[in-house]
Every structure is written in C-alpha cells, then in structure tokens.
Amino acid sequence: MTDIVDELKWRGLVALSTDEDALRKAFADGPVTFYCGFDPTAPSLHLGNLVQILTMRRIQQAGNRPLGLVGGATGLIGDPKPNSERTLNSREVVAEWVERLRAQIAPLLDFEGPNAAIMVNNLDWTQGLSAIEFLRDVGKYFRVNKMIAKEAVSRRLNSDAGISYTEFSYQILQGMDFLELYRRYGCTLQTGGSDQWGNLTSGTDLIHRAEPDAVVHALGTPLITKADGTKFGKTESGTIWLDPEMTTPYAFYQFWLNADDRDVSKFLRIFSFKSHEEIEELEKQTEERPQARAAQRALAEELTTLVHGADQTAAVIAASKALFGQGELTELDEATLAAALSELPHVKVAEPAPVVDLFAEVALVASKSAARRTIKEGGAYVNNVKVAAEDAVPAKEDLLHGRWLVLRRGKKNLAAVEVTGG
C-alpha cells in the first residue's frame, strides 16, 4: 500500500507538519485516530471545507479512524477574522447549523468497519465546564506571549479593530478539543487548513504540557490558489456551497466543468479519488486536446456524484448537454431545468415577445438589428430550434414547463426567458 504521507504529498495536500518523519512512523505503526474540526459559522460547508473532508476520507481509506468534529461550542465564538470582530450567532442558530453540517460531512466518511468514523460535538465537553475549572484545568497550560504571537491574533492586535477576550480565547477552546479527543479516543493527529496552523498547534502544545508522554501531530493542507489570481471556491455569483439549496447541483457541476486548464491538474490531485495513472492520463489529454475538456468533465462528474449523488449528477449532465443543443430540453424535469436556467442571464416577461426583442433584452446581442443579423446568419436558437424568420414570436406551446424559453446565440452563448403571464 502507498505510504499515506507520500500520497498526500503527491496530491499537493501537505503544506505544514509538526514532524513529518514522526507522522510517517505513526501511520506505519497505525492505525491512527485523527480529527478535523468544522465550525458552524454558516448554514452550509463550502469547497474549502470539502478539501478537509476529502483529506479525512483519504486518510480513512488508508486504514485510519476519523473523528469529524462539529464545533457547537467554538461556533458560538468563532475564530478571529483578519480585520474585524465576528457577529455572534444565537445558540439556536448554531445548534441548527451543527446538524446541517453533520449531515453534509457524514455521507463522505465511512461509519462501518474497524476504523469507522465518529461524529463529535465539542459542546459536549464544554457546556458543563465552569469558569474556574476552565482557568485551572486548561488555561494554566497556555502562555500569553505564545498566544499573542499567533498570526490571527497578532494581526488583529495591530489593527484598529483590536481583539476581544472572547476571540482571543478561541485557540484555547480548539486546543482543548484536541486534548479531550486524545483522552477520550486516543486521537493523535489533527488535520486542517494551513491558515488554521496557529490553532492546530495550540492543541499539540496543550497536550505536550498536560500529557508529557503523549506523541501527537498536526498536519496542515495548503491554501488553494487559482492561476488567474481569483479566490478559489467563488464565482461571480458568490461562494460555492455544498448545500443544494444554496448552490444548485448544476452550478456545482459547472464550477468544476469551467475550471481553467492551468488549474484542473491541481484540482484533480486534490479532490479526485482517481488513481495516479488515471489522473496523469487526463493531464496528458488536457495538454494534447484542451478543447475536449476531458479532465474537467471527469472532475465535475466525480465530485458532483460525491456531494450530490448519482441521480442528481445524471440530471445535471443531461441539462448541461441539452442547453448546448446536445440533448432534448423537453426531457428535463422542471426542477432541474429551473436550477440550470437560474445560472444563466435571464429576464422575465409577461407574454412571449418577438425573438429579436428577447435577444436584445437579455443582452445576447447589442441591439435588435444585431439580433436580426444573427437570425439571418443562422446563429439564433430558441429551445435549440434554429430561428428562421426575423419576425418570429414564440408560441405559448413552445414554453418549457409552461414558462421557460432557452435562447442561444451560436454554440455557447446562452440566456433564459421566464414568461410569467397566465
């Protein structure tokens, strides 16, 4: 079996480690019980979180036991943001978000077998803790000079916003999580993003002080960057969430399908569970025939299936093909069609209007005269049917599910019209 540290490094998933050689030995002697934490600071996880979940999945598949921690306690506080204090959410909201995050993490881990995953909530060991117990049993192991030196804290201390004692103490709570999981489950490794390195090492430092004989580790994954300099996991429409109500499966699929050729190799290694040979073959195809987008299609299908399931993925692929004239729009169910069209430029009209008006209104062309030229040149389509006449007006019978028209200029320029009249 491939050494899991070598595997993670090949995939570009190792940025920082407390002691790589010691960690490698721990895995060799294994199994290792490890954890990664997720704070409920939003009602859904996002692609940055997905990196961590899939890293957990890889380490579990190598024979180790994952603990998925959802921070019912740390989520009530929040780790320090770079420039300002967080707005505290109510206990009720945080409790609801805890359950939503648990439901998103659980399908991606294996909860059966000898190394079955376990979900934990740090509220379980903090809510009954008195202030005196916290200060005597945990706080005494932390040194303020080291806490101040953590990047997240020092940055805030040097800003106009400053930092509250609440957020300053966040690293103590996260360190306490590692200690508690070490004592309860024999957990000896915490994984997380390299931007959380200060919090990760708070845990290892605490354990070294409280349990001097313990051997524990931290592993940090790198910040994912994109070749064009834009932030990973965001589009013009906003953050890519795992919750299908916040980011549709269609938009999720399209995010990966639209990956830059310069990024797709990195994304395959980080997110895909394909073998080295399969990934290298897709990399070769991208280099030789980039227009085929074979790597992007493979990545989009695999990840959409992982997060949203095979049925949703099949519907999304059918919608994607149909929108570009490679399938029947009439065969798409209303929910799938509506989700796909919501990602396109679109307008609402009371009644079907002349095609030239619709093309201009939705900005597929610059003007009505440009729309007429497009029709004359054979480049205008409504519901994948070429528009033959410059004065064409869609009939109500043409509306998909009684309300939608899909406009296309050429092969790739799409827009939607929603007809709202009865």
UniProtKB/Swiss-Prot annotation:
An annotated GO cellular component: cytosol
Residue numbers binding ATP: K234
Residue span, S4 RNA-binding domain: 353-419
Stated name of the protein: Tyrosine--tRNA ligase
GO molecular function annotations of the record: ATP binding; RNA binding; tyrosine-tRNA ligase activity
Motif ('HIGH' region): 40-49
Residue positions binding L-tyrosine: Y35, Y170, Q174
Similarity comment: Belongs to the class-I aminoacyl-tRNA synthetase family. TyrS type 1 subfamily.
Motif ('KMSKS' region): 231-235
Enzyme class of the recorded protein, top EC level: ligase
GO biological process: tyrosyl-tRNA aminoacylation
Biological role stated in the UniProt entry: Catalyzes the attachment of tyrosine to tRNA(Tyr) in a two-step reaction: tyrosine is first activated by ATP to form Tyr-AMP and then transferred to the acceptor end of tRNA(Tyr).
Record's keyword terms, sorted: Aminoacyl-tRNA synthetase, ATP-binding, Cytoplasm, Ligase, Nucleotide-binding, Protein biosynthesis, RNA-binding
Reaction(s) the record says it catalyses: tRNA(Tyr) + L-tyrosine + ATP = L-tyrosyl-tRNA(Tyr) + AMP + diphosphate + H(+)
EC numbers: 6.1.1.1
Intracellular or extracellular location(s): Cytoplasm
Subunit structure: Homodimer.
CDD domains: TyrRS_core (cd00805)
